[in-house]
Amino acid sequence: MSRSSDLFHKAQTIIPGGVNSPVRAFKGVGGEPVFFKSGKGAYLTDVDDKQYIDYVGSWGPLILGHCHPKVIEAVDNVLHSGMSFGAPTELEIQLAEKIASLMPSIEKIRMVNSGTEATMTAIRLARGFTNKNKFIKFNGCYHGHSDSLLVKAGSGLLTLGIPSTPGIPQSITEHTLTADFNNLEQVAQLFEKYPNDIATVILEPVPGNMGFILPKIEFLKGLRELCDQYNALLIFDEVMTGFRVGLHGAQGLFGIKPDITTLGKIIGGGMPVGALGGKREIMSFLAPEGPVYQAGTLSGNPLAMAAGLATLKEIEKINFFEDLSNATNKLTEALADAAENANIPFFAASLGGMFGFCFTDKNSVENYLDVASSDEVLFKKFFHAMLAQGVYFAPSMYEAGFVSSMHGDLEIQKTYDAAELVLNQLKSA
């Protein structure tokens, strides 16, 4: 028995399912999860001393790769000064100013501890500001695990085949309206049905928890117009896409200005973090300036602020995102070439340092149903065979993958070689 297997069995006796986040349990691909002990650059090393090229990147935060020296230095400096004070620090201001300088839609920002906290607070803020109750989300978009948002969500719910979750009374979700991503007509119909009671529309501008879905620009523009027409707020959940698909987030790439933006992952440089920001008059509704309450013991903690600030300083360097996008494109092209050589239907897409793929003969993937109809059995076989070759993709076909600045031509060539070998073996099996 491997040490990973031994640890997993031990973990199951004390931790529900043996993991602290469901997708880590490998339920989406079968088998047992790998336990890791270290990471450096583009690589992870497991507890059995096997090395892997890492395309998960802690689910997005590690855009600079594992243990980047600038991030380590920043955290180390703070570590010896105090990990948390429960009081204001200068680092909070510095990170807030840096984020606002890179995302013009953000005039004020509140730091929290996770993406879930950020989206939960954003919905509360939108309701408080507009004095309306209902909100629209999209099937397959994941906005954390707060009760009102865990309806037809993506991420682990899709991986586990759970359409929603027990433990949430219907009374809590009665104000949650859902529509299909990229379907503007459905959104318009909801606004027509509830013209005076929709507080906000929330979406991942580039969903990464129902596979990897690129938005239609007309869809995003239409959402902005509908929100303006009905005096509703537009929330971009950029916890995943913020500073990952481009220096100014998805909103910068597509030229759409949301009223509220939620952030996480990269702005903490690998530390637990979340944030919500937006127009001054909206953000001023948050306590203690306004009546909408939100608080957190570790919000704005120095370790996360230091790691996030160091990360943002690195990614704003000249050509960073051009190089990152090129590397991600090379990866998806390499995977597509390997699939084509094996005559296996395959679709891949990427944006910035984010990508996704599935085994399908469709020429485009536009929503959750397109991903769900792809060959999941083949994905599972591909995942495990690639893992055996030392390539670690997300253990679910519903999760996006991530490339860091440390993934170079060598790593992509190794990935291509492994994919070509694996896909030819699967084709002939």
From Swiss-Prot:
It catalyses: (S)-4-amino-5-oxopentanoate = 5-aminolevulinate. It is found in: Cytoplasm. The modification N6-(pyridoxal phosphate)lysine is found at residue 265. Signal peptide: none annotated. This is Glutamate-1-semialdehyde 2,1-aminomutase. Belongs to the class-III pyridoxal-phosphate-dependent aminotransferase family. HemL subfamily. Keywords: Cytoplasm, Isomerase, Porphyrin biosynthesis, Pyridoxal phosphate. Homodimer. InterPro entries: 4pyrrol_synth_GluAld_NH2Trfase, Aminotrans_3, Aminotrans_3_PPA_site, PyrdxlP-dep_Trfase, PyrdxlP-dep_Trfase_major, PyrdxlP-dep_Trfase_small. CDD domains: OAT_like (cd00610). Pathway: Porphyrin-containing compound metabolism; protoporphyrin-IX biosynthesis; 5-aminolevulinate from L-glutamyl-tRNA(Glu): step 2/2. It holds the Pfam family Aminotran_3. Its cofactor is pyridoxal 5'-phosphate. Its main location: cytoplasm. HAMAP family: HemL_aminotrans_3. One of its GO terms (cellular component) is cytoplasm. GO terms for molecular function: glutamate-1-semialdehyde 2,1-aminomutase activity; pyridoxal phosphate binding; transaminase activity. GO terms for biological process: protoporphyrinogen IX biosynthetic process. Its EC number is 5.4.3.8.
